[in-house]
Each structure stands twice: as C-alpha cells, then as structure tokens.
Amino acid sequence: MSRPIILDCDPGHDDAIALILALAHPELNPLAVTTSAGNQTPDKTLKNALRILTLLNRSDIPVAGGAVKPLSRELMIADNVHGETGLDGPALPAPSFQPQAVNAVELMAEKIRQSDKPVTLVPTGPLTNIALLLASHGELHAKIERIVLMGGAAGVGNWTPAAEFNIFVDPEAADIVFKSGIPITMCGLDVTHQAQIMDEDIERIRAIPNPVAKCVAELLDFFMIYHRAPKWGFVGAPLHDPCTIAWLLNPALFDAQDCWVGIETQSELTLGMTVVDRYQLTGKPTNATVLFGIDRQGFVDLLVDSLAVYTPTYLNRR
C-alpha cells in the first residue's frame, strides 16, 4: 500500500533532489507539491517545482504556490547557496503545465480531506505553509499521520550560530508546528551534515544513463561550490532535504531518539533555535523523533539506485 504524502518545499537543489527521490518509489503517493519562499523568492521556487515535475513527466501532480513571506517577519532567501534561479547548474525544461488556481494551504486541505488514509506532510523549507494549514484547518489534524520535516539542529546552526535556515526564516511558524501535537520527525543538521555527497558519488550518478541522473549530477556540481568553503569543514556537500524521503523509505538507515523540541522565538542571540531536550531535562513530554545519525553509504546507495529507475520507459509510463 502506498503512503500518501504532500511535499511542501522551496526548491532549492536539495529540495529538487528530495522530490526526484520520492517520485522514484511507488510506495510513496504524492498527492500534491506546494511551495513557499525560502531558498529563493516565491515565484522562483514555484517555477522550480514545475520545472522538476516537467523533467519527470509528472504534470499529473497538482502544484500550488503558498506563503510569499513568513508569518510575521520579512523574507530572507538563500540565493548565495542556490544561485539566481534557485536551481542553478543544469538546463532544466520550461514548465509544461500551470499551478493550481488555489493556494498551497487550500490545496493541502483539499487533498487531506479527500484522502482515504492519513496523509504525511513533508516540508523541506520554512514551515509557514504548514503552520497556516494547522491554524486554519483544525478539523484536519486527525487526518495528518505525521510531519517529516527538514529543519533545526540539536547542535550548532548553519544560518546563525544557534539556528538552522528553515527554522530561522519563520520561527513562529515552527513554534506552531512543534506545538501541534501531530507526530513529527525532525531531520536536522545533526543528521543532514552527515549525509554528505562526495565527488565520487556524483560521478556514480553522472554515469547513470538517463537525463534525470544527469540533471542531478549537474545540480550537485553547483551545490558543491558553496559547501567547499573551508569554514564548513565538509569533504562533500550535505544533502539536507533528501533525508526526509530516505527516512520514509528506510528508517533503518537512521539513528533516532524521541525528544521534546521547543522553538526560540524571542531571543536576540538564539532566535530560531530548536531546543532539543535529549536528556529529558525539562520533564516535558516528547513531541518529535529527532534524527541524530545516518548510514551515509546506505543513503547514497538509495539515491543512486533510485535515480537508475528513471529510464525512458519509466518516464513515459503515464
């Protein structure tokens, strides 16, 4: 039985790869793709989702744009990481179809309402759309099985010393999500910084004889540029967002622990910090399964094997 999911993203190189990974596996049933501002401006992230789905010949999946800014803050973007288009590197096709007339929140609500099984939400950008959905459609909470998100860190941040980018962009939205009572899997920097793709892995991907793998290799070529800065201490580039999909496909690849997680929304120094109570110091009930470790080679093998699925026959099956 396939698991119904909705991907809420801000493509973004690693968002695009997460989407490509998800659509290689029939055990995941993408009901919709929604977008928000984050890695680039809202018009660009929406276009990028359409471009990736066009590459995959999946115009059957409805797409809607969502929040153009955080709940109560000014928008910031990560164009220094993802380039002018948000997906700099490969020559992607122009979108072959249009987004839905409704916004992201209403598309998500419609798909959750219509689904005969509880839906898993997979946000890989700022949590604004998810927070708006939860705030405006309380009647649908029981139909959301889990939220598997990329964001946060138990340790250091990557946008400030304390905060990871997705949470820092809209900490008030993250606060709503983590207080919702819906089961959460948190794929934070603790695990995603271990999910590094190396030069030799990119060459494995480049050797796969299909256009989707070629596109991913070229996305990674560009993504590597930012992460080669000595300050990070990386050998490769961390594939943050695909960790969400990898966990859905094979949670045995990960080490996890149930923790209470709170979001800092006020401090000047630690705004956007995910406060992870790994040692139950607060006595508060756990609200998230936090990923701390990963089988990196197993993760890379999953990605490589998934990209090999995109043969001409697979791409033209619909």
Curated annotation (Swiss-Prot):
GO biological process, one term: pyrimidine nucleobase metabolic process
Domain of life: Bacteria
Short name of any one Pfam family annotated for the protein: IU_nuc_hydro
Xref: CDD domains: nuc_hydro_IU_UC_XIUA
Record-linked SUPFAM superfamilies: Nucleoside hydrolase
PROSITE patterns linked: IUNH
Keywords from the UniProt entry: Glycosidase, Hydrolase
GO cellular component: cytosol
Active site feature: H240
Protein family (similarity comment): Belongs to the IUNH family. RihA subfamily.
Purpose: Hydrolyzes cytidine or uridine to ribose and cytosine or uracil, respectively.
Protein's UniProt name: Pyrimidine-specific ribonucleoside hydrolase RihA
Organism: Shewanella sp. (strain MR-7)
Gene designation per UniProt: rihA
